């Protein structure tokens, strides 16, 4: 039997600022446990904190940003997206294939 190959992904998640710290932790745990339940592995989580949104989403002007690096079989992504759409605490999400886990996030300064 052929072994299924996993792919490395970078997931960006924006949670509602109306969540308490405990509720936000549980919402993040719901996302990570979903990945693990489908046979995935969490490699790195970057907590990017509270940031202003580019535009209003469901009345929110700010959100808590997390960047998660994980590996999973590619066919699982569609199932994860279904779960994400049902998660009311999650304002937005984006999942991209990537080649490497970034240990440190660096951002360029905006020009003056």
UniProtKB/Swiss-Prot annotation:
UniProt GO BP: translation
Q: Do you know which InterPro entries this protein is assigned to? A: Ribosomal_bS6, Ribosomal_bS6_sf, Ribosomal_S6_plastid/chlpt, Transl_elong_EF1B/ribsomal_bS6
SUPFAM superfamilies assigned to the protein according to its UniProt record, in alphabetical order: Ribosomal protein S6 (SSF54995)
Q: Could you list this entry's UniProt keywords, alphabetically sorted.
A: Ribonucleoprotein, Ribosomal protein, RNA-binding, rRNA-binding
Q: Which GO terms describe its molecular function?
A: small ribosomal subunit rRNA binding; structural constituent of ribosome
GO cellular component annotations of the record: cytoplasm; ribonucleoprotein complex; ribosome
UniProt-listed Pfam families: Ribosomal_S6
Question: What CDD domains does this protein's entry cite?
Answer: bS6
Q: Which Gene3D superfamilies match?
A: 3.30.70.60
User: What role does it play?
Assistant: Binds together with bS18 to 16S ribosomal RNA.
Family the UniProt entry places it in: Belongs to the bacterial ribosomal protein bS6 family.
The record's annotation in PANTHER family points to: MITOCHONDRIAL 28S RIBOSOMAL PROTEIN S6, SMALL RIBOSOMAL SUBUNIT PROTEIN BS6M
Q: What is this protein called?
A: Small ribosomal subunit protein bS6
Gene of origin?
A: rpsF
């Amino acid at each position: 039997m052929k072994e299924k190959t996993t792919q490395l992904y970078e997931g960006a998640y924006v949670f509602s600022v109306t969540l308490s710290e405990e509720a936000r932790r549980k919402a993040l745990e719901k996302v990570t446990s979903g990945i693990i339940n489908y046979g995935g592995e969490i490699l790195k989580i970057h907590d990017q904190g509270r940031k202003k949104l580019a535009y209003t989403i469901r009345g929110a002007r700010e959100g808590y940003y997390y960047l998660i690096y994980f590996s999973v079989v590619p066919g699982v992504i569609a199932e994860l997206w279904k779960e994400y759409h049902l998660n009311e605490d999650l304002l937005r999400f984006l999942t991209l294939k990537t080649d490497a886990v970034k240990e440190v996030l660096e951002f360029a300064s905006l020009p003056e």
